[in-house]
């Protein structure tokens, strides 16, 4: 038995949304597109559909081979048995190879150009209404989904994230201006496909206040360029987004009386108090300013602003070391 299923949405991504227009995110009629697709699929038949799927998937998946052991021992062992042995402390490099490739497979299956980026639980979870509305959490979750994308030779799978970030820029400019009196754009801990960039409605700033997550998202734009060396992408799409994020970062920093700069107020993602110069925030500040500096050099633009970024970077409060020799997460032990 062959089941053919199609699905679509009337959602249309919009990089320049008009929030006075209730249809600013409305595109195609899904009844028409799904009917067309199902008819075309029926014409193709199972074997042709399977071969097209296999060619599409393996073109990405087969790019990377990972071999942690040359041993062929236990390669046919069932996964349940492997996991049981692994939990007992027995080494299984082949299981680790499988897990790495499983992660690549999940990204291939959930993040392709023209679609939404991978979200909190994915679309195949076992709930009618998934935890946290299965949205996009910008304070580590969506970044974590894409950490291995380029390094695992799946740069195409980054495009849904790139487009999602682009869709946050215009509403993020309003958030930057309204909440922080800053240039540029930013986002908050939670976002959705309809341009939501403001903090959530809560008095608990320890987890809800995290304006530096916008620049954290923007670092993925430079990472994509860094791997692909697509200068046209950097010039036409990437640089302005990175630059605008760096401008927000500059305006958000506190220029202290001693001449140094620090992120204040700042928080560590959903962990600990509101503080001055949280290490997480300073790490992101350093990265986005470095990305902006490098991008402007590659394109040979904005030398004056680049000098400002370099000056602030040099005067950013350094990471602090605690009484036990540890890297402090907050300003004091």
Which ranges hold each PLM region?
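Alpha-helical scaffold segments in carbohydrate-active enzymes
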Residues: 56, 98-109, 164-167, 171, ...
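Conserved hydrophobic/aromatic pocket- or pore-lining residues that grip, position, or stack substrates
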Residues: 103, 145, 217
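Acidic/polar, glycine-enriched structural segments that form the non-catalytic walls/loops
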Residues: 1-136, 155-175
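Extended ligand-binding clefts on enzyme/binding-domain cores
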Residues: 95, 134-156, 168, 174, ...
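Alpha-helix C-terminal capping/termination sites
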Residues: 89, 96, 108-109, 145, ...
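Solvent-exposed, acidic/flexible segments
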Residues: 89-96, 100, 138, 142, ...
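The feature captures the catalytic groove of carbohydrate-active enzymes
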Residues: 13, 20, 26-34, 119-136, ...
